[in-house]
Amino acid sequence: MQVIETLAQGLKRELKVVIPADEMEARMNERLVEVKDRVRINGFRPGKVPVAHLKKVYGKSIMADLVNEIVREKPTEILTSRGEKSATQPEIGMTEDEAEADKILKAEADFEFTVAYEIIPPIELKDASGIKVTREVVDVGEDEVNEQIERIAESARTYESKKGKAANGDRVTIDYLGKVDGEAFDGGKDEDAELVLGSNRFIPGFEEQLVGAKAGDEKTITVTFPADYPAANLAGKEATFDVTVKDVAAAAPIEINDELATKLGLESVDKLKEIVRGQIESQFGSITRQKVKRQLLDQLDELYQFDTPERLVDAEFENIWRQINTDLQQAGKTFADEDTTEEEARAEYRKLAQRRVRLGLVLSEIGEKAGVQVSDDEMQNSLFQQLRQFPGQEKEIIEYFRNTPGAAASLRAPLFEEKVVDHLLTEVSVTDKKVSKEELTAEDDADEKPAKKTASKKKAAAKADAAEGEEAAAPKRKAPAKKKASDESAE
């Protein structure tokens, strides 16, 4: 077998592989001898069929199998011998000339094929001790815990129907139909919708006009959708809602005590406080983790600069671009609404794709050199988390991960990445800084705002961490249900 390099440009490689006809014929004859005793042909005793006759009957079929085996196995062997790793599955090229292909199958011509691929660039690991990150820490105080418990108690509050007019704090049950320019619009209709007046769940002006209403009342409410409403076809538009009030209910008083804890399935209010404190600490810890990780990745991105395999970047860009267009479509917006153009957005997200690929390769190399491993138990736990997100679809999900090429790798990748980050945090300088809840969440809130042209680079950088999964929140279906897109993102 002869291997000739025909292209070495940047990360691109192309090889020409030639296996002489006599070598292919020798392999075929070996295979014929192997099957000789198992073949049954009329007129011949078992094991007595001449090889020449077997070749005449089965030669081309066996040669075709050999060709398939060679193109399936040899590229990996060749790359290993060259000390190279292909970024993606190599592309195999063979003759499309039927006459030439027939000669190969008859061992009358050399078998030639090409292997085209992009190599993963060699990465020389650098000293990470100069990297400095700040870990923001929030002390969870009693006030924070009590506020959260009050919100829990509020969500568990009961209401009792009352006669008379609705006031702020009362819950009204309504049917409504929204119209713009006299025409009903998608998402503008609901029945038996429950709304606590004063909760500011609906768009400005909606709830205020229901104060004083009684069960059985029919009202027409006029409101104006906010200019930044996520559904572009409604943003800034005046709308009317035909509302039927079906019930008015007064809120029952709530008390934070052992009785409340019992309703929630806990033995005491102290246990409730303990659980709530743990949940808050976990939430703050997740934000802190992402901010530390972002700092780490930003500095790694500055530390490592090298060409990235084009095919990996193309694939990553397509994933990003598909999500961006889905988000825009769901929000009823265009690139112009985001103060940019499709061309500018493509360029920006192309840079993001390059960054993701580069950081992915760096983290992979660091993890490999550090001996980072993802255990079977960790994979199993990750799969269970997936199953919990989709109750009733457990069988389909398990089948998907079992039968879909690359599915298990997609489950492993974020686990591996987080473990590499853990490893790096033992090597870099980490300084703890106590901050308030508002300081901790301020930057994250800013990242959730619509990506205007001036903010697009910042948002792109924030999204470069593949594990963060930051995506624009999809707008709710019911038109009056939220007053701002940013409110939706918070839910």
From Swiss-Prot:
Lineage top rank: taxon: Bacteria
Region (Disordered): 434-491
Record keywords, A-Z: Cell cycle, Cell division, Chaperone, Cytoplasm, Isomerase, Rotamase
EC number: 5.2.1.8
GO molecular function terms attached to this record: peptidyl-prolyl cis-trans isomerase activity; protein folding chaperone; ribosome binding
Gene Ontology annotations of biological process type: 'de novo' cotranslational protein folding; cell division; chaperone-mediated protein folding; protein transport; protein unfolding
Secretion signal span: none
Main location: cytoplasm
Enzyme class, first EC level, given as a word: isomerase
GO cellular component: cytoplasm
Recorded family membership: Belongs to the FKBP-type PPIase family. Tig subfamily.
Function: Involved in protein export. Acts as a chaperone by maintaining the newly synthesized protein in an open conformation. Functions as a peptidyl-prolyl cis-trans isomerase.
Protein name: Trigger factor
Originating gene: tig
